[in-house]
Amino acid sequence: MTQVVIDATFEQETAEGLVLIDFWATWCGPCLMQAPILEQLSEEISEDELKIVKIDVDENPETAQKFGIMSIPTLL
């Protein structure tokens, strides 16, 4: 299952291992279209192999700004 992170927990949740970060927003159509694909991927791959996290850019602008996110969806 994908994990939702916020600015306050981002560093802690992404500090170890291989992490795929999904920068998204609730109003973003393409973000909503790719969400089921990322969810399926998270179910097929163990968290030890790849951790998938989501961060809402509207509610967590600090992290989005830190990574220079200019458009969404963006995967890092």
Where are these regions (language model features)?
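Typically the conserved alpha-helix immediately C-terminal to a functionally engaged Cys/Sec
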Residues: L32-S46
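Structural signature of beta-strand start/N-cap positions in the alpha/beta core
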Residues: V19, E49-K51
